[in-house]
């Protein structure tokens, strides 16, 4: 996982929403918009539930791009990237 934020804050996401970098949202390549996903950082065991509202990540090898707010909760903000496990919770 990686995160994206300040440069995209206030822009439209692929779902048509306005991106809030402090929110608990994420970008995924194919999960339907509105899907809730538990993301667990394998380095520290911390988890956050996010809602998919955008498409990505664009960088190879990454399964999800988190908002800055979600990344901060699970400890990805400082490192920039982390190995994660995704659990799809539904809509």
Give the ranges of each region predicted by the language model.
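Secreted/periplasmic proteins
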Residues: 1-91
